[in-house]
Amino acid sequence: MPERINKLQPNRTLHLRGFDNLGAAAALHSATADSFEVSGVFRDPADFAVLILHDMDNFYEHPRLKHLPDSDFDGLTLTFDVRFEGLMTLDSPKFPTIDWPYLDVIRDDATSSTAQIPLSAPGRFIQVGGTQTAATATFTIVNNGLQQFDRLVLWYLNFNFDYLVEQPVECLYGFVGAGAGTVHRITVAGVDYTHTESLADTNTSIALALIAALGTSPQVTATQDTGAANQIIIRAALDDHAPVTVSSSSSATAFTLYGIGAGTVAASLATRINALDWVGLGVLMPLTATSTGATLTIASQKTGVDGNMLTVYAVPKNSRLTTTAPQVTLSGAVSDAIWRVTLDFAALGVPKIRQMWFTYAPALANSARLTSTEWRAIYSNFALTGPDAKQQLLVAGLDSVRVEQNDVWCTYSGIWADELGFFSSGYARRANAIGAKVTVHYACATTHDLYLGTSIYSDRANANIRLDGDTSTVLNCHLASLTAVNTRRRVRTGVPAGEHIVTIEVATPGFFYFDFLEAVVATSVPDPPPARLDLSPALDYSTDHTYKLSPARLMWNFDRLGFAGPMNEYIGVFWWNQRQRIGATIPAVTVTFAGTYVPGDAVFVNIGGQAIGKSVFPNESNALIARHFAYYINATYVGVWAAAVGGTLVIESRSPMPAYAFTFNAFAETVAGSTGSVTTVGALNTGVPGTWQVDPAQSPALNRGAQDWHRDFYTECHLRSRPIVTACSMELVNPPMEFVARFPDGAPVITSVGFGSLNSAHCSFAAPMRNYQKAVYLSIANLMAEVGLVPQLQLGEFLWWFFSNQTSSGGGMAYYDDETQALALAALGRPLHTFVQPTDDPAINAGADAVFLRNRLRDHAAAIIAHVQATHPAAKFELLFPYDVNHPTPAGVFHLGGALNRFINLPAEWETKPGSGFDTLKMEALDFGAWSRNLDLAKMAIRLPLDLGWPKASVRYLVPVFRPYSAWEQEYLLAVGEGIPFINLWAFDHVCLYGLRLQTPNQSPRAQASD
């Protein structure tokens, strides 16, 4: 049945844009029609990942499945629920160093204008589940006999909440005997407390008697003055801040005392905190406070874990009024909510969308360096509402007609040049002169829309389009973009069935690309072609068409394209590894506060142009000033963190990446009598990013993103009963140097991977690499077994490096890592012979040196197989053997191979299945098929295992399709003709990008020709 797909459908249209740095990893997985998950690991605060929700110019699918460009979101609304783990939360008020709080949009308009839509804005963001709490902390106020003018100051950022005991809380009266019968009196709130003097009384006894009398007063306490025995200290007893009048017969002076205790102080401080105009002052994380007795509870007004970064500290004048702790850090906040987000695209000002995406960033480490953090973003109830016709994405149906740039139906005038690239069939034609023209004849049996396949970019020319001589229209191919986009644009609608002529003429300066013309009969996704049980494209996890897609979308592609044969995945050389950073320098500055600061001084720290300060109050030490800035920085900044020890403050950039480089300055503004000073050492703009090196110590060997993706991928395979073999090779990007193979001059084997500036290293068969590969293969086997698969693993191109650096002085073949040389010396009784090139004679020294090397390869593979099968006895292993670089004599356009390569890279035990340790042998000869285009050589590769005695049922073949116009269909037919049961195409991305034919090819007389 045809299948309808929709915009923003998680298992059909979403994909990763990618993630930043080799230390990071991300995966889109567990996708259904209304849910999905993105997960991974971040190891640096500068790491981020991007999920593309919509791209009107679909890069991924084969033309049979690739949806037509559609930017219309007018009248559509997206609603979803989401929960984050280990990420910056959507509701965090922190400054966004990357766009994690937003939906980013590029509009489909003339200027490709952009929009940033806050996801947590009121009205579109509500909590529907989970837990979301605020951080709190408590101060206990201590009254150790506080006196008038005692002081307690709480500091948060540079806000002080200052409590001064302004009213008297006690008074003193002295009593002197005046003769028997004299009535001595103290009056409290109108109540007299008396003692009638006797003949036996002394001044002291009179005072003690009055103290005893006052013991019944609820409003005051009375104690004997330790300095004068006849004096009474009277203190307000209630902690209610209420006045009480006290007078005495011994003095004409009356006092009004106030009931000030720890509770009064706590309540007053709470009032001060709550009275601050937090909003007007623009405070990022405002506070609120309550008091119960002597306990002052301070809470973040905002919920979420950012509150756990806040510290409030206390500065008492003396020990009479203080707190049990000198500072409190708020804690207990939880950010584990499920948020519902609603996005009405038209109301948000984005009715036409070319691209939109979410960004993920690591949660901010609290007052510390970020450690490796695994993370998840879990989406559910992901639903688009609005008119059905606008929700649906259409494809060019089976009645559509595509005319390629090199078809006979195209006539060119002017200067045009072919350009190789990710175009339909692998080529497009380019012109850069006004007036260059292509005329295309085509016929379509159905009413259709007309699309032009082209390339849009910032330097592209416009073209005038005419259909059957109608009025010319302009196709604008300019796009403000960092990279060119190969896509299609609609140039006519509702074209009637029949034959037509289209002229396309370059109209403005710049480059114009003609890829194809397509008469599109728009439909839902068509039924798949007949399933091909012997064939499937191979996957390379390193490529966009694998790691950026969810397994659900990937397997849907295979299903709808009719690829039902056993699958082959190469895990690649970089995205899956656990890594550690080496050679990095994280910038830091040390600030020392010295001398003696006095009230009225002000101290400032300026980081990246953002200044924070400290107003100096009484009793504030240099250590306290340092702590103040540490608390302030850790509560506020996202680019740095700080720690204080004594009077020294250390501020460190959170990352050595350029985005985290900041200017820095610290200074003091002092008043008369101050000797305070500030000195700084270091800088915050001297970071060295270092290298993200493979870390063999981490377990499991696959990072979180690769684990989650493969677990889901293997689940999808298991649901289809689809065999899958996963391969590793001897190449890694940034491995530990003890892994790397060496030429005789000690130079490492380094080769380009074709992705940016990354290079991979070919590794040796040394113990460190072997132990690492044991862990890797076991991790993969565990994931397969976890979902119910029998593990099937491939040793992909397990070879000694097949090229020489003989052009270098002391160069040769890459057999000379330290371990191999040491073991050769022990085994041969002499140094290993220096082999110079692949064509060297392996029989030198009676073949002892070459046999030693060959057996090292054999034993390396056997050790890995034994290690995995100790845990998974039923695990199956496949060898992928590249015959082009191991041909016994140089062959093909690049003259690959040689006797030495052939001898050492295919151990004698592997030439037949019994005793090889392998269940299947897969042959490849990428050069012979894709570059040399020599079917005779390809046939030799196909036949090699058969000629050696391997049973056909255990042989597989890998056909290269990565070069346009190679004779891949004929190579496939050769393999079928030899009885090879299962064939893979290298690789899936090229099948889609070039739009390769899906039908089973027919045998033709050209099958033996080098097409």
Question: Which residues make up each language-model segment?
Answer:
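Extracellular ligand-binding interfaces
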Residues: G86-G130, W339, P387, T454-L475
